[in-house]
């Protein structure tokens, strides 16, 4: 899911436990206006919502964390080292074996198993670190006590209450991150209502406990953001002697094409037409710049988290998982073969 830089999130998450929570004053005019809005727009009973907000806790430490200057982004070789560990790869293989059927089923949407695994591995270590805050506390705190982004978080609070009603959840029960991201794949409420899928067919979308729902929802999110079955995510490139004038590194848009990059002298091996959208990515390696070319599926991953580093880490972890655990052959309908960075070179 799109959210703040991972390292800034981690630092802020640690800080949120230092200040005590205080009861939210549900009689505040802004809270009462929100309750009236929910009643008018969506038919909620004001008295029932008032009882819910009477039990909500505002957390000043969350506001303090949001106000803290963003942590400097780590260079690629340090960022990658956080996610490409033996422990994370081994846990991913273990998860793949335990959840083979949910993975197989979700992959029928056209997203290979290793990418579904990799996103859950990067987001929450395969469900181990899904957050410890009540979602309603986090969202209400940011909706009513953090003016710079109050509009956004009031919208997410609205979506969360609708989600809770649709899924027959006690709105005081779900837990997640300090910013309100939920479950194993860390969906915000708007994303949950838009892209979460009932993968196991039980009538509910459970991103905390159902791996069928988790993997199907991640696959649906990526497909809805442009993922193309059978196409590569990214390949390594050689930019030695290439004309890189005018290229804006760090941008997420696919502003070039396979053909235009080759015309500049960038060397890479991929079986895509010259007209295929592409972006040249420069990463800070241990021995100097590393160049890669990202394609439409790379861009789809950046819709989950708007960072080239994030999408590159997901791609590398997916490749490592595929090497450590050979995904079983797909049953009908057949998914296209996985294309890794190394196999495309």
Spell out what each predicted region is:
Residues 81-94, 143-146, 150-151, 193-209, ...:
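Substrate-binding clefts and substrate-entry loops adjacent to catalytic sites
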Residues 58-65, 124-134, 145-150, 166-172, ...:
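Secretory-pathway/luminal and periplasmic proteins that interact with or process carbohydrate-rich
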Residues 16-20:
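N-terminal signal peptide c-region/cleavage motif recognized by signal peptidases
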Residues 171, 175-286:
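Flexible, glycine-rich surface segments
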Residues 1-9:
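Bacterial N-terminal signal peptides that target proteins for export
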Residues 50-58, 112-127, 160-165, 218-219:
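Short, functionally critical alpha-helical segments immediately adjacent to catalytic or ligand/cofactor-binding
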Residues 24-107:
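An acidic, Gly/Ser/Thr/Pro-rich helix-cap/linker signature
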Residues 30, 41, 237-345:
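C-terminal soluble interaction/assembly domains
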């Amino acid at each position: 899911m799109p959210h703040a830089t991972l390292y800034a999130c981690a630092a802020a998450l640690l800080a949120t436990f230092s200040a005590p929570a205080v009861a939210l004053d549900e009689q505040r005019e802004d809270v009462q206006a929100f309750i009236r809005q929910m009643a008018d727009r969506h038919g909620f009973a004001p008295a029932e919502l008032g009882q819910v907000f009477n039990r909500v806790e505002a957390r000043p430490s969350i506001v303090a964390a949001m106000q803290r200057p963003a942590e400097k982004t780590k260079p690629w070789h340090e960022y990658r080292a956080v996610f490409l560990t033996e422990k994370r790869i081994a846990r991913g293989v273990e998860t793949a074996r335990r959840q083979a059927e949910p993975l197989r089923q979700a992959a029928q949407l056209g997203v290979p198993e290793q990418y579904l695994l990799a996103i859950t591995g990067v987001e929450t270590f395969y469900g181990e670190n899904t957050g410890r805050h009540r979602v309603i506390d986090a969202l209400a705190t940011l909706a009513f006590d953090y003016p710079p982004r109050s509009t956004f978080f009031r919208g997410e609070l609205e979506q969360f209450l609708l989600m809770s009603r649709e899924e027959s959840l006690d709105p005081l029960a779900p837990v997640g991150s300090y910013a309100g991201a939920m479950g194993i794949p860390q969906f915000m409420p708007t994303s949950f209502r838009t892209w979460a899928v009932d993968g196991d067919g039980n009538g509910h979308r459970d991103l905390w406990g159902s791996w069928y729902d988790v993997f199907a929802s991640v696959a649906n999110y990526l497909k809805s953001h442009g993922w193309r079955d059978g196409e590569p995510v990214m390949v390594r490139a050689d930019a030695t002697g290439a004309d890189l004038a005018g290229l804006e590194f760090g941008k997420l848009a696919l502003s070039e094409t396979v053909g235009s990059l080759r015309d500049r002298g960038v060397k890479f091996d991929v079986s895509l037409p010259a007209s295929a959208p592409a972006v040249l990515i420069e990463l800070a390696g241990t021995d100097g710049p590393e160049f890669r070319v990202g394609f439409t599926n790379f861009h789809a991953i950046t819709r989950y988290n708007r960072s080239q580093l994030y999408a590159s880490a997901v791609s590398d972890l997916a490749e490592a998982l595929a090497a450590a655990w050979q995904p079983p052959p797909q049953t009908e309908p057949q998914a296209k073969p996985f294309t890794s960075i190394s196999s495309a070179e």
